[in-house]
């Protein structure tokens, strides 16, 4: 694709792609980002009207905004002079949604660091509001966190200013006062709606739960609880096990949150929040109270029993840590890596690294070996703390491309998928854009370019990729996960479309046939056992059945609710039990 900037013609290719959403693609070019809108069909009258409003916004975009607002620096045009998009500063980092993921945060990003991020974001919002600019669609996918810089606001071209509306708002961050309101006609957002979204993000990042998350006996969904102003600060809302209790927060923070979520107070975040100081108790709990609320309630010598029973569910603690679980796999038994006291060790206590993981580093388990990938794509195979092999893999926007099983390790080299064990080329993929997973017998991956998804299946130890034409989606890719048994694969993809998170799932046979698919499902990791599907949710384990090619929700095993959440990884065992890998523990669940 050719675009024209002030410097002349620029060619953008798939290898330069940084990200893709429902509205545009973003490319890397000479240290800057070029956002190119998707083409609109001449027959699409609504789409052409929306694009016209977008171009008007670009022409009237305010100048002199804070450098943390990644607005247009110049326009990108076609050879005829038509506006195709714009150029903005390129920033490398993670979206703010990662701050609400406990497996990502624990041991790496403290609550004090989170407080600093949001203190700086509050300053940016105050400046914007003073200039008459409202973010509108403020959500954790539009905020980029990059070290001590920022945070940065992206998608600035959708902001509300100069009488031009912000046409969309993400439902998880949208002020309930705007539910059911047409956002596209006139300006509907105001500074108060930004502060509501800000409060949702801060609360979720401190406590790992949405303020209207959890489960409630009568108000069954997050949106219904938001409409009723019934937050997790109420005692009748059951928190997911991944969440930290709101009782870890200071009174000043709780007072503001209650006002925002339950009384429609829309005041800016008070400065007292940024003086919140967290401490970590010897029990591992991070809190901002004079005394640890967990130890105060249970007593300093209280311990959690190794076996817990609720109804039909028995939960056995296989491993607990005051550090964090880094990664886990089911490979002839449960294998995992723990980071504790600044050291990484395997499940048998053997050394992996005598230091913490750096930002951008990832681990993958391959039998007795542990593969470490770094932010530049460098790979090392570690055994007992020693490097026994080195390699290199490609980098995608989500990180280094690497997948491993007991006897299989896969990486990429330019446009090729490589079997690291044999050195053979398995098949062609898209350089820098491929997602990849492998089980013991089957592997799965996909790449996207130009709004088109190419998914593929392969068998470990063999060459050749089987394309999966029945797998595809639209919208911005938020996350993806795959699970396997000996003859099946389950792909779960979450996208953001028109302000909603949509969960898609495909159950695949070993030949690549789509046995069933489901769309708009519950969030949560999936697991497979002989073709049977179960997902972990904040309400407990939920089985999925197949009906006429559709994945349909079956039984919700509510007795499992205290032991599993949507953020936990599920690893099935051959005896029918399920291993749940949390942020700081590994549990074995059995149903009688």
Question: Which role fits each region the language model picked out?
Answer:
Residues 1-16, 49:
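Juxta-kinase regulatory segment immediately upstream of eukaryotic protein kinase catalytic domains
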Residues 320-330, 356-369, 392-407, 427-442, ...:
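Repeated scaffold domains used in trafficking and secretory/extracellular systems
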Residues 125, 129-146:
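Catalytic-loop of the protein kinase fold
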Residues 14-71, 99-108:
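ATP-binding glycine-rich loop module of kinase domains
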Residues 141-182:
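Activation segment/activation loop of eukaryotic-type protein kinase catalytic domains
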Residues 67-117:
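Conserved structural core of kinase catalytic domains
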Residues 182, 190-263:
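C-terminal lobe helix-coil module of Hanks-type protein kinase domains
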Residues 302-321, 340-357, 377-395, 412-432, ...:
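Surface-exposed loop/turn elements that mediate protein-protein interactions on large endomembrane-trafficking
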């Amino acid at each position: 694709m050719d675009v024209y900037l002030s410097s002349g013609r620029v060619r953008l290719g798939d290898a330069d792609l940084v990200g893709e959403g429902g509205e545009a693609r973003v490319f890397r070019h000479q240290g800057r980002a070029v956002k190119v809108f998707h083409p609109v069909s001449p027959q699409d009258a609504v789409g052409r009207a929306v694009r016209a409003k977008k171009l008007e916004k670009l022409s009237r975009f305010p100048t002199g905004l804070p450098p943390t607002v990644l607005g247009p620096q110049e326009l990108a045009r076609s050879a005829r002079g038509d506006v195709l998009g714009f150029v903005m500063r390129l920033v490398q980092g993670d979206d703010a949604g990662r701050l609400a993921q406990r497996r990502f945060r624990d041991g790496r990003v403290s609550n004090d660091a989170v407080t600093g991020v949001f203190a700086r974001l509050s300053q940016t919002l105050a400046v914007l509001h003073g200039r008459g600019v409202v973010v509108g669609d403020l959500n954790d996918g539009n905020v980029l966190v990059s070290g001590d810089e920022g945070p940065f606001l992206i998608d600035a071209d959708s902001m509300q200013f100069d009488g031009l509306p912000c046409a969309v708002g993400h439902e998880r961050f949208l002020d309930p006062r705007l539910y059911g309101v047409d956002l596209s006609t006139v300006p509907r957002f105001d500074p108060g709606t930004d502060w509501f979204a800000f409060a949702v993000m801060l609360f979720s990042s401190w406590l790992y739960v949405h303020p209207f998350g959890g489960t409630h006996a009568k108000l069954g969904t997050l949106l219904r609880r938001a409409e009723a102003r019934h937050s997790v600060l109420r005692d009748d809302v059951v928190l997911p096990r991944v969440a930290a209790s709101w009782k870890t927060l200071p009174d000043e923070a709780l007072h503001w949150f209650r006002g925002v979520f339950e009384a429609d107070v829309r005041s800016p975040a008070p400065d007292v929040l940024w003086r919140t100081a967290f401490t970590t108790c010897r029990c591992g709990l991070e809190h901002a109270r004079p005394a640890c609320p967990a130890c105060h309630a249970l007593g300093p010598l209280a311990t959690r029993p190794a076996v817990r029973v609720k109804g039909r569910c028995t939960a056995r603690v296989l491993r607990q840590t005051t550090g964090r679980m880094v990664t886990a796999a089911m490979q002839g038994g449960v294998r995992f890596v723990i980071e504790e006291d600044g050291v990484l060790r395997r499940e048998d206590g053997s050394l992996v690294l005598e230091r913490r993981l750096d930002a951008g580093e990832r681990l993958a388990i391959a039998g007795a070996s542990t593969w470490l990938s770094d932010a530049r794509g460098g790979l090392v195979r570690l055994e007992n703390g020693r490097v026994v092999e080195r390699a290199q893999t490609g980098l995608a926007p989500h990180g280094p491309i690497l997948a491993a099983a007991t006897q299989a390790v896969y990486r990429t080299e330019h446009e090729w998928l490589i079997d690291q064990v044999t050195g053979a080329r398995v098949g062609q993929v898209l350089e820098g854009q491929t997602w990849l997973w492998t089980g013991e017998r089957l592997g799965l991956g996909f790449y996207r370019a130009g709004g088109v998804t190419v998914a593929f299946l392969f068998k470990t130890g063999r060459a050749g990729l089987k394309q999966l034409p029945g797998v595809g989606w639209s919208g911005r890719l938020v996350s993806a996960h795959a699970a396997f048994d000996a003859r099946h694969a389950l792909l779960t993809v979450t996208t953001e479309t028109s302000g909603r998170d949509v969960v898609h799932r495909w159950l695949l046979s070993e030949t690549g046939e789509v046995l069933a698919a489901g769309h708009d499902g519950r969030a949560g990791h999936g697991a497979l056992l002989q073709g049977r599907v179960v997902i972990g949710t904040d309400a407990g384990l939920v089985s999925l059945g197949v009906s006429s090619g559709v994945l349909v929700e079956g039984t919700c095993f509510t007795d499992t609710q205290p032991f599993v959440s949507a953020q936990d990884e599920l690893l099935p065992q051959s005896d029918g039990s399920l291993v749940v890998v949390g942020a700081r523990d590994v549990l074995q669940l059995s149903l009688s």
